[in-house]
């Protein structure tokens, strides 16, 4: 494979033959804004292009604008940034339609419990259209896995924080596999070798380079080895948002030498380039054999040298020629139907939950221990006057603290949300499918978590006999579990920080618990805030009422009717039955799930706003949160 890039290409011949994508950007400026530091230019008048069949590497020191350039031309610029300039596809203003492009992020956000084969197969079922049979989708997945050199590790689990799995290089190749199943013509990769050793980096980049045929590939990369650098066709070298060099990667060494900064013998050229233009550690750099200049002076010399070179003129000429062409429009490809996506996601999520010990199994074990402790504490509570308080305390603990412990699954919720956000951003499926799948897959486990510990605590305590009473108790507990999980999923989708999410979720539940009507009876609650509206908003009120009515109605303790105990001791509203309380809880569950869906949809705006508020510098912007239609701007 040669990395020599011709100065010009006859587009009229190439475009019809391979249907490739020519991407150009001209006089591209990007400005980032922050509350603390105001506005700052991140990209400053960049011009360049990417062509089919070639790998363009965007290089530069940290903070040079590599990822910002990649995000801008990929249409993923963050909400706290503004851009100007032209970005054209095949010489036209058009959007990057689904299936025509793919973006591989720097982080490998994958489900750790799945095998490589499962991850790619499920992704194929989600992305590829219903018009394709299951065997055809499987064949595409197998070919993709083989193309990335993963056929020998297909049955190995990916692994993560919950257990050991495949290597970092293999994870990166899996991430790439998931994005090229639709055979996109344009592939963006953000730091594909980040965190990998030199050998793994080479094999990952070699696999990427092997995908170049008929495809335009653009990758931001920090410090490639000599072997990795040899795989690049074109090089875009940035420093402080300005172009230092754009042209054939093989000609970069000559350019630096002609500019007065030759690469020393036996030194990695990319190391020399980055060391020369890195202004973060300003130092005197040798020019020729005698003179020394500061880094800023060197950068200015290189930029002026580039603008006066044939390479600069070739770029301007090539961009102008591409822009004059009437290339093909990118058609949006179809993917699996909403029902298919919901079913596939449900199946995938169910398997993930079954294998992730921290999702439900560990919580089930803890719940069983607590239920045994609760049952032994209130064992055979009896019918004495003291049993009124004992029954109430036991039911309150079940409805409040057992459900409160759903925050234990928050780490798994966060991992789910990360995977969802990556897949949604890349167009694999929509928010509705995810919320439905999350709800359906969680129900069997939460039912199990409600029934087993609930039965232990219920029968050890000696609460009301009768199958109906226990079923109602379990239904209320199950519904409360679902409500709390919905609440925690809402928090996980809104709060970008793990610790903040735990604190926020626990804080919200604590306020609801305090206003539920047990720690202070309903009539004693302060009316502002605690009773109106919090008492009526908290699900604890209806859980307490339902469980207490289920237990005390029809019960006699020392010749006192259970109804009188409910009315006078617990100050329960007896104008409606316990089934109304259950219906209200079910309504709240539906409301919370709908709210979860709305928050997920609005998260593209809310989450970047939170990040922008928390950031201290425009350099900390995360540009992959909200895609903007930059091609229509």
Swiss-Prot record:
Tissue: Restricted to the petals, with the highest expression in the limb and, to a lesser extent, in petal tubes, probably in both epidermal and mesophyll cell layers.
Keywords from the named record: ATP-binding, Cell membrane, Glycoprotein, Membrane, Nucleotide-binding, Transmembrane, Transmembrane helix, Transport
Quaternary structure note: Homodimer.
Keyword hit for Glycoprotein: yes
Conditions for induction: In fragrant cultivars (e.g. cv. Mitchell and cv. V26), increases before the onset of volatile emission at the end of the light period, peaks at night and decreases when volatile emission declines early morning; this precise regulation is tuned by ODO1 binding and activation of its promoter.
Entry's transmembrane regions: 364-384, 394-414, 440-460, 470-490, 498-518, 580-600
GO terms for biological process, alphabetical: green leaf volatile biosynthetic process; transmembrane transport
Effect of gene knockout: Disturbed release of volatile organic compounds (VOCs) in flowers, including benzoides and phenylpropanoids, which accumulate to toxic levels in the plasma membrane.
Residues linked to a glycan: 352
Recorded superkingdom: Eukaryota
InterPro entries, A to Z: AAA+_ATPase, ABC2_TM, ABC_transporter-like_ATP-bd, ABC_transporter-like_CS, ABCG_dom, P-loop_NTPase, Plant_ABCG
Membrane topology reported for the UniProt record: Multi-pass membrane protein
Domain ABC transmembrane type-2: start-end pairs: 340-552
Source organism of the structure: Petunia hybrida
Family according to the record: Belongs to the ABC transporter superfamily. ABCG family.
Protein name: ABC transporter G family member 1
The keyword Acyltransferase is annotated on this UniProt entry: no
PROSITE patterns, sorted: ABC_TRANSPORTER_1 (PS00211), ABC_TRANSPORTER_2 (PS50893)
Record-linked PANTHER family: ABC TRANSPORTER G FAMILY MEMBER 11, ABC TRANSPORTER G FAMILY MEMBER 11-LIKE
Protein's job: ABC transporter controlling the release of volatile organic compounds (VOCs), including floral volatile benzenoids and phenylpropanoids (FVBP), in flowers of fragrant cultivars (e.g. cv. Mitchell and cv. V26). This scent, mostly produced in the evening and night by the petals, attracts the pollinators (e.g. the night-active hawkmoth pollinator Manduca sexta).
Molecular function GO terms recorded: ABC-type transporter activity; ATP binding; ATP hydrolysis activity
Residues of the ABC transporter domain: 23-265
Binding site residues for ATP: 60-67
GO cellular component: plasma membrane
């Amino acid at each position: 494979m040669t990395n020599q890039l011709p100065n010009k290409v006859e587009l009229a011949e190439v475009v019809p033959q391979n249907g490739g994508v020519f991407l150009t950007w001209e006089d591209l400026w990007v400005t980032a804004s922050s509350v603390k530091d105001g506005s700052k230019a991140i990209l400053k008048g960049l011009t360049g292009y990417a062509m089919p069949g070639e790998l363009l590497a965007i290089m530069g020191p940290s903070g040079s604008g590599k990822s910002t350039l990649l995000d801008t031309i990929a249409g993923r610029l963050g909400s706290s940034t503004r851009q100007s300039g032209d970005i054209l596809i095949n010489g036209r203003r058009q959007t990057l339609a689904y299936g025509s492009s793919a973006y591989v992020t720097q982080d490998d956000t994958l489900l750790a419990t799945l095998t490589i084969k499962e991850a790619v197969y499920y992704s194929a079922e989600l992305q590829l259209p219903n018009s394709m049979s299951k065997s055809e989708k499987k064949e595409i997945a197998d070919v993709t896995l083989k193309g990335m050199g993963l056929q020998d590790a297909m049955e190995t689990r990916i692994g993560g924080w919950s257990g050991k799995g495949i290597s970092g290089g293999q994870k990166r190749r899996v991430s790439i596999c998931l994005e090229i199943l639709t055979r996109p013509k344009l592939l963006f990769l953000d730091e594909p070798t980040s965190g990998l050793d030199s050998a793994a980096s080479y094999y990952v980049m070699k696999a990427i380079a092997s995908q170049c045929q008929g495809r335009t590939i653009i990758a931001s990369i920090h410090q490639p080895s000599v072997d990795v650098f040899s795989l690049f066709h074109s090089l875009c070298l940035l420093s402080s948002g300005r172009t230092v060099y754009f042209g054939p990667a093989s000609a970069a060494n000559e350019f630096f030498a002609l500019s007065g900064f030759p690469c020393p013998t036996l030194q990695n050229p990319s190391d020399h380039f980055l060391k020369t233009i890195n202004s973060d550690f300003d130092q005197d750099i040798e020019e020729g054999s005698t003179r020394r200049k500061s880094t800023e002076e060197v950068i200015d010399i290189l930029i002026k040298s580039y603008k006066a070179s044939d390479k600069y003129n070739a770029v301007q000429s090539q961009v102008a020629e591409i822009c004059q062409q009437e290339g093909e429009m990118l058609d949006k490809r179809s993917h699996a139907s909403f029902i298919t996506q919901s079913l596939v996601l449900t199946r995938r999520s169910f398997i993930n939950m079954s294998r992730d010990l921290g999702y439900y199994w560990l919580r089930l074990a803890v719940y069983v221990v607590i239920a045994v402790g609760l049952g032994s504490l209130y064992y055979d509570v009896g019918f004495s006057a003291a049993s009124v308080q004992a029954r109430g305390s036991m039911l309150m603990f079940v409805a409040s603290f057992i459900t409160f412990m759903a925050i234990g699954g928050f780490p798994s919720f966060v991992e789910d949300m990360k995977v969802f956000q990556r897949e949604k951003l890349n167009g694999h499926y929509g928010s509705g499918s995810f919320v439905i799948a999350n709800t359906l897959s969680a129900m069997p486990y939460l039912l199990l978590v409600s029934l087993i510990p609930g039965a232990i605590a219920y029968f050890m305590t000696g609460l009301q006999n009768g199958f109906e009473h226990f079923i109602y108790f379990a239904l209320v507990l199950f519904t409360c579990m679902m409500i709390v999980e919905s609440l925690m999923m809402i928090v996980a989708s809104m709060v970008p920080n793990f610790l903040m999410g735990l604190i926020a979720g626990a804080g919200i539940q604590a306020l609801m618990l305090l206003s539920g009507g047990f720690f202070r009876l309903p009539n004693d609650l302060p009316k502002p805030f605690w009773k109106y509206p919090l008492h009526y908003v908290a699900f604890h009120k209806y859980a307490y009422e339902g469980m207490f009515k289920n237990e005390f109605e029809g019960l006699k303790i020392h010749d006192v009717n259970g109804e009188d105990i409910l009315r006078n001791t617990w100050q329960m509203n007896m104008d409606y039955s316990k089934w109304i309380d259950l219906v209200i809880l079910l309504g709240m569950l539906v409301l919370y799930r709908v709210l979860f869906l709305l928050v997920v949809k609005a998260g593209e705006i809310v989450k970047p706003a939170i990040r922008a508020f928390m950031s201290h510098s425009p350099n900390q912007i995360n540009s992959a949160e909200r895609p903007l239609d930059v091609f229509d701007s």
